[in-house]
Amino acid sequence: KFVKKNKIFLIEDCSQAHGAIYRGKKVGSFGHISTWSFCQDKIISTGGEGGMISTNNKKLWLKLWSLKDHGKNYKSLFNKKHKSGFKWLHDDYGSNYRMTEMQAVIGREQLKSLDLQIKKRNFIANLYLEGLKNYYLKYDIFKKPDFNFQKSSSKKNLRKSNQFVHAFYRLNLFLNKNKIKQRKLIQQFIKNKINCGVGSCPEIYREKIFMKSKFYPKKRLLNAK
């Protein structure tokens, strides 16, 4: 409603959210365009590198198809009759963003087990949060998680929990800085053979290449983190 009212073009970044559900809808089904990453550390990978753009807008799809295939015109290639000889098909600029057949096969096979993988990720996250609950309930070292990661036995709560499913690309813990230093906590995790990192990527516009652009904001966009 907000997007329609304000005439906003919605692009979903689903790079780390394969299989997630929000308000009963799969992530990637809200926007005009959804982007997906399949590089080596994502929930689904296509052999190391890769990605995908999805849309239900035919006009956008035709443009995207052209961009990934050297600027070819889809209708000229498939719907137009040509004389014998060379076919003139490139109506625009584009590049080679085409995924190989082998990469697609790897991704499609992983897609079959996506639901099972999400269940397993939720189960593992539940184990961690159960083991750490004293740290946020008793000692106030972590902020209490604000997502529902447990499946309830009651039908009412089960329906509610199915409306929101976390993909758990990562399990994020928010620290109370007054209680513990971040570096010390990370060292404790590593000591116990638990892989632990810091935060997430900051705003991309802060890269040097964008600083030279006329689009660079005069002030930090705090809500874009």
Model regions and ranges:
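Short beta-strand-to-turn element immediately C-terminal to the catalytic PLP-Schiff-base lysine
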Residues: 36-37, 51-56, 108
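Short acidic donor-binding loop at the edge of a beta-strand
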Residues: 33, 50, 63
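A structure-centric signal for secondary-structure junctions around beta-strands
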Residues: 30-32, 47-48, 99-101, 168
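PLP-dependent aminotransferase class I/II
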Residues: 1, 9, 17, 21, ...
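Conserved PLP phosphate-binding loop immediately N-terminal to the Schiff-base lysine helix
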Residues: 1, 6-37
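Glycine-rich phosphate-binding loop of ATP-grasp-fold ATP-dependent ligases
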Residues: 43, 47-52
